[in-house]
């Protein structure tokens, strides 16, 4: 059966993404000084105000107010008429240390307690919380990501680029994109059905002018030729006007764009957000590891599509469960594939941190346009360095 599937993205000026970037900018500043910092920072942004709250345990000192203001200004909220201005907005902070009850399990995992510290080094740090995390990959795009979320991100990035480079000078920072793709009976993308762009703009711009310039400077340069058609339904600012935007129009919160951050709704999500969390939080690090495994499995040709779920208990280093699904696309025995994954990939938090080199100030740039499918050497979970090892396990 043919079906339509839709995914969305948002620009860096979207209120929730402003909050995510502030939280991750604070994390980067702390982890740059203290790689072992324990950080869980949440941000709220609204008209003229940014509120930062959370738990931090560290020897580092950072100027949170300065980080907040610089992040807002870098995004593009530089003028009071936007309703939110990094120079003049209020900044309120409420930061305290990590709960000692949580620290008991993170600082010394259950496995280390049971072995009286004589065990494996990677058994020493426990998961910072319970929960389940998902990783996914598909061979339908070069990014090993679903086509709808890839195109939605590319449109959002292009929308921001033409604003910042003043190619379209009347755009403002807030914006959203959405792409609907038709899939064939065998799950292959066939064509783009609908493209939706909502772009904040200056008040003197007409809707027809906006449609014309976005088609010329954003949509056509972004959509691959193989998917372009004059039959694509294109919607631009369907309400007819988008002048009021950003935090002055909608309150933004850290962690409210978890589907944008991951796979565009193509697979389940455990619910845990990424931004503002140091890598001992498996909400972040285990998601990255799961993506790493999934991408390498598909790139190795072991399946056309692959999903992995991993679950944790707070204070315990080793996952409590691991499940895989190839959606009937596996080229090898699935039970053996699961065994090989367990043998080759270590999902304990400290092992993930070491493997992916996560104790670095790399997180602010993950906080907009998706954590996965990005061509950036700092996104170590996108590496394909396990492909050959996986192939050898199956004598390929």
From Swiss-Prot:
SUBUNIT field: Homotetramer; dimer of dimers.
Q: Which UniProt keywords apply?
A: ATP-binding, Cytoplasm, Magnesium, Metal-binding, Nucleotide-binding, One-carbon metabolism, Potassium, Transferase
Which residues of the sequence carry a binding annotation for L-methionine? 55, 98, 250, 281
Q: What does the entry list as the binding residues for Mg(2+)?
A: 16
User: What's the domain of life for this entry?
Assistant: Bacteria
Q: What is its EC number?
A: 2.5.1.6
Q: Which cofactor does it need?
A: Mg(2+); K(+)
Q: In which pathway does it act?
A: Amino-acid biosynthesis; S-adenosyl-L-methionine biosynthesis; S-adenosyl-L-methionine from L-methionine: step 1/1
Q: What is the reaction catalyzed?
A: L-methionine + ATP + H2O = S-adenosyl-L-methionine + phosphate + diphosphate
The protein's job, in short, is:
Catalyzes the formation of S-adenosylmethionine (AdoMet) from methionine and ATP. The overall synthetic reaction is composed of two sequential steps, AdoMet formation and the subsequent tripolyphosphate hydrolysis which occurs prior to release of AdoMet from the enzyme.
State the SUPFAM superfamilies in the record.
Answer: S-adenosylmethionine synthetase (SSF55973)
Q: What is this protein called?
A: S-adenosylmethionine synthase
Ligand binding (ATP): 14, 174-176, 241-242, 250, 256-257, 273, 277
Family affiliation: Belongs to the AdoMet synthase family.
Task: Report the PANTHER family cross-referenced here.
Answer: S-ADENOSYLMETHIONINE SYNTHETASE
The ranges of region (Flexible loop) come to 98-108
| Matching InterPro entries | ADOMET_SYNTHASE_CS, S-AdoMet_synt_C, S-AdoMet_synt_central, S-AdoMet_synt_N, S-AdoMet_synthetase, S-AdoMet_synthetase_sfam
Q: How is the cofactor bound?
A: Binds 2 divalent ions per subunit. Binds 1 potassium ion per subunit.
């Amino acid at each position: 059966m043919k079906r339509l599937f839709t995914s969305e993205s948002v620009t860096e000026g979207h209120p929730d993404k402003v909050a995510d970037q502030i939280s991750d900018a604070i994390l980067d500043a702390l982890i740059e000084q203290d790689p072992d910092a324990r950080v869980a920072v949440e941000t709220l942004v609204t008209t003229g105000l940014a509120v930062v709250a959370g738990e931090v345990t560290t020897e580092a000192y950072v100027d949170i107010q300065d980080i907040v203001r610089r992040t807002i200004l870098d995004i593009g909220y530089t003028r009071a008429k936007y309703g939110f201005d990094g120079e003049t907005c209020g900044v309120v902070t409420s930061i305290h240390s990590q709960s000692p009850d949580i620290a008991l399990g993170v600082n010394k995992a259950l496995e280390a307690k049971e072995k009286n510290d004589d065990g494996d080094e990677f058994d020493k740090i426990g998961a910072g919380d319970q929960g389940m995390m998902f990783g996914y990959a598909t061979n339908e795009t070069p990014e090993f990501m679903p086509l709808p979320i890839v195109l939605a991100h590319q449109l959002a990035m292009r929308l921001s680029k033409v604003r910042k480079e003043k190619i379209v000078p009347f755009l403002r920072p807030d914006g959203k994109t959405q792409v609907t793709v038709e899939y064939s009976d065998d799950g292959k993308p066939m064509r783009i059905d609908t493209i939706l762009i909502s772009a904040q703009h200056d008040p003197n711009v007409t809707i027809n002018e906006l449609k014309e310039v976005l088609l010329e400077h954003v949509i056509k340069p972004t959509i691959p030729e193989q998917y372009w058609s004059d039959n694509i339904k294109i919607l631009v600012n369907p309400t007819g006007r988008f002048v009021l935007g950003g935090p002055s129009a909608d309150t933004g919160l850290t962690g409210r764009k978890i589907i944008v951050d991951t796979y565009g709704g193509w697979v389940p999500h455990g619910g845990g957000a990424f931004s503002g969390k140091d890598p001992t939080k498996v909400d972040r690090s285990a998601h990255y590891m799961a993506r790493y495994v999934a991408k390498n499995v598909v790139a190795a040709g072991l399946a056309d599509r692959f999903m992995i779920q991993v679950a944790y208990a707070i204070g315990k280093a080793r996952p409590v469960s691991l499940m895989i699904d190839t959606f009937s696309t596996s080229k090898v025995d699935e039970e053996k594939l699961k065994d090989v994954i367990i043998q080759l990939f270590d999902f304990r938090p400290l092992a993930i941190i070491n493997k992916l080199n996560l104790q670095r100030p790399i997180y602010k740039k993950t906080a907009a346009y998706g954590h996965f499918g990005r061509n950036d050497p700092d996104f170590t979970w996108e590496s394909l360095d396990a492909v050959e090892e996986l192939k050898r396990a199956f004598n390929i």
